[in-house]
């Protein structure tokens, strides 16, 4: 499992995960990334989302219809910037991940988890076993295909 210490985070990763910041839309690593695999918490290495639930939302950030497990994310009321939103944090590391909105695809439950790329790390499908995430292979529709 991949893990990082807080002192290993770059400035943007620290701003996003520890200070509840937001990276620029359309200028982040995973907003337009659709390779098969999983997205893990940058600090704890815990799996949070899969490419199976990722969709194009035109918002400029990675968007997912659901989390891999409700046990790995925490949803909190966020009243910052004069808005009322639902913040998403990692359960294990208490890192800010992004927000969840009710404007996602209806056929997948209507949620859009809008996640900062700086808060997660992508693990390609073909590296899951090697990096200790082999138990997640059954979460993919076409197991064995890359």
UniProtKB/Swiss-Prot annotation:
Q: Which domain of life is it from?
A: Bacteria
Q: Which GO terms describe its molecular function?
A: peptide-methionine (R)-S-oxide reductase activity
Q: Where is the active site?
A: 114
List the keywords (alphabetical). Answer: Oxidoreductase
This entry's Enzyme Commission designation comes to 1.8.4.12
Q: A Gene Ontology CC term for this entry?
A: cytoplasm
Q: Which residues form the MsrB domain?
A: 2-125
Q: Which GO terms describe its biological process?
A: protein repair; response to oxidative stress
Catalytically driven reaction(s): L-methionyl-[protein] + [thioredoxin]-disulfide + H2O = L-methionyl-(R)-S-oxide-[protein] + [thioredoxin]-dithiol
**InterPro entries (UniProt xref):** Met_Sox_Rdtase_MsrB, Met_Sox_Rdtase_MsrB_dom, Mss4-like_sf
What the record says about family reads: Belongs to the MsrB Met sulfoxide reductase family.
* HAMAP family per record: MsrB
Q: What is this protein called?
A: Peptide methionine sulfoxide reductase MsrB
């Amino acid at each position: 499992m991949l893990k990082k210490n807080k002192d290993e985070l770059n400035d943007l990763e620290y701003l996003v995960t520890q200070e509840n910041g937001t990276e620029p839309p359309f200028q982040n690593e995973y907003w337009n990334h659709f390779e098969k695999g999983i997205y893990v918490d940058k600090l704890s290495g815990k799996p949070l989302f899969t490419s199976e639930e990722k969709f194009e939302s035109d918002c400029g950030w990675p968007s997912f219809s659901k989390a891999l497990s409700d046990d790995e994310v925490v949803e909190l009321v966020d009243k910052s910037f004069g808005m009322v939103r639902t913040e998403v944090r990692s359960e294990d590391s208490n890192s800010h991940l992004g927000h969840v909105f009710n404007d996602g695809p209806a056929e997948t439950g209507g949620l859009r988890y809008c996640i900062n790329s700086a808060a997660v790390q992508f693990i390609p499908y073909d590296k899951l076993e090697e990096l200790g995430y082999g138990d997640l292979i059954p979460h993919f529709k076409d197991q064995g295909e890359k």
